[in-house]
């Protein structure tokens, strides 16, 4: 009886496959013949393990640089996962509150992993080795992570990413180029003495400005902040859950993540009242602390007091250590 049921199940599956292949002008028999000769899939081929493990190429012989480059590659893979969820949220693929909440919670888990694992960079690098190999990486910088810049642009209105000094200069209808030139992180990538663009910023603009302009235009009206209003209804419990999740995402991206970098910078770049500059020439003491930038993706979800004190207590706690 079991064999008969299995045969019926196989017949049904073959019929479904035949229909699928017919719709695309393909012959199922040809593909079945190919399966006869194909090898079974294995783990190392599926994840392209050999290729993956060949991508870590330190620039020096200092052992801890391997940790440094590997961790940054892991970070970019997590950013890819965040963007994967965010694309579904902003492209109309999510149409109910429960799914919207699920996607936000997924992104929070990715950021939670990033923030909690940053001790690999803070505590897990030999300070003397780091001081040496970092000089071989100039002028590259984590500042140049385009995936993180895209996460920001997909999360909120571009006006919320403008440097505080320029907020009053811009109006909603201004061209994307006007906004791009005044984003907070561009101000943080200028020489602290001359005010000129660092080579780090020049390289980044040359490679990615066109892409970022496209993202600004594409997500003006469908970024995550715009999408969230479809699901905020005071009468539904899911609305309060979504608010909690979005606030958590805001904190991860704009407080905990930059301050994890700030803490690492304090540990590795400050000693005996002497402060070293970042490899990219960025002013990390002004660029990283949220209390200076006050970048908030969802300002309407925070009280005035919370916004006024954005990231302050965390910074004070870390500087004391």
Task: Pin down the residues of each PLM region.
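Surface-exposed peri-terminal alpha-helical interaction modules
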Residues: 2-321
